[in-house]
Amino acid sequence: MQAGGIPGFALTFAAPAKINLALHVVGQRADGHHLLESLVTFAECGDRVGLIAADRDRFTVSGRFATDLSAEGNGGNLVLRARDLLRRELAAQGRMAGPVHLHLEKNLPIASGIGGGSADAAATLRGLLSLWGATVEAASLNSLALQLGADVPMCLDRGPLVARGIGEEITPLPDLPPFDVVLVNPLVAVSTPVIFRSLVRKTNPPLVLPEDARSTAEWLTAMAAMRNDLEPPARAHEPMIETVSNALRDAGAALVRMSGSGATCFGLFTGMKSAERAAETISAGHPRWYVQATRTAGKSG
């Protein structure tokens, strides 16, 4: 939950943007799911979910990208799927889960590689447990989250972590420092299944974490040797990703990489003022793009 909630709602829960600082594809299961090793953190920016008890279920949407979400149809929205899944789980335990008005403030682009839908689902699960005064064991909650998508369990965590398996094997990384970052998306949706199907190599070198890195500079050096194995096929599918990456480099980013399956790219900067100046420069040159200077979660000092 966060201060400065959505007006008219009893509770507001943040759904922060997920950033894959590195994403290595290391294999593929017999069922077709790819095995990943990913260094993940979360930004201060993101969507928000408002909740209040109601006489009937309602779902409303606002925010810059509300229209894009509505165009997809409410039936497939992860917020509603999370509500229905948790309600069934609680009903099976003989517990009440009354009608609720859910409101999604959609501030992140759709299909952008920064986990917007997964974060929305995770925030909905956390928010409904609070609104309904219910508890679910951590293992059961993670199981529910995984039914909604491979990224949802890590979005429940919201702290720096390493994700393995299909994304559900989570190891917290409390010593990862925060980073000043600029997120840029050219507002071109990228299909995750298409990018995975386009992978030429399904088995790539594993993610190697530094043993003694503590400072931001040490982590930047270590991350420079990491990869996003989805970036080459994503660039081939959507050449605009290269344009975005070049814009971040030209603006002075110390490290530039694509997040998830794209098309969002991030640039890491040495200080928030530098990040904000870069965001202003990129926005001036590309006023229709999504450009956001922000800071990530992490251990300061």
UniProtKB/Swiss-Prot annotation:
Listed EC numbers: 2.7.1.148
Family annotation (Pfam families): GHMP_kinases_C (PF08544), GHMP_kinases_N (PF00288)
Biological process per Gene Ontology, one example term: isopentenyl diphosphate biosynthetic process, methylerythritol 4-phosphate pathway
Binding site for ATP: P109, I110, A111, S112, G113, I114, G115, G116, G117, S118, A119
Catalytic residues (positions): K18, D151
Catalytic activity of the protein: 4-CDP-2-C-methyl-D-erythritol + ATP = 4-CDP-2-C-methyl-D-erythritol 2-phosphate + ADP + H(+)
The UniProt record lists the keyword ATP-binding: yes
Function: Catalyzes the phosphorylation of the position 2 hydroxy group of 4-diphosphocytidyl-2C-methyl-D-erythritol.
UniProt-listed InterPro entries: GHMP_kinase_C_dom, GHMP_kinase_C_sf, GHMP_kinase_N_dom, IspE, Ribosomal_Su5_D2-typ_SF, Ribsml_uS5_D2-typ_fold_subgr
Superkingdom of the organism of origin: Bacteria
Species this chain originates from: Rhizobium meliloti (strain 1021) (Ensifer meliloti)
Pathway recorded for this protein: Isoprenoid biosynthesis; isopentenyl diphosphate biosynthesis via DXP pathway; isopentenyl diphosphate from 1-deoxy-D-xylulose 5-phosphate: step 3/6
Protein name, UniProt field: 4-diphosphocytidyl-2-C-methyl-D-erythritol kinase
Family according to the record: Belongs to the GHMP kinase family. IspE subfamily.
GO molecular function, one term: 4-(cytidine 5'-diphospho)-2-C-methyl-D-erythritol kinase activity
Record's keyword terms, sorted: ATP-binding, Isoprene biosynthesis, Kinase, Nucleotide-binding, Transferase
Enzyme class (EC, first level): transferase
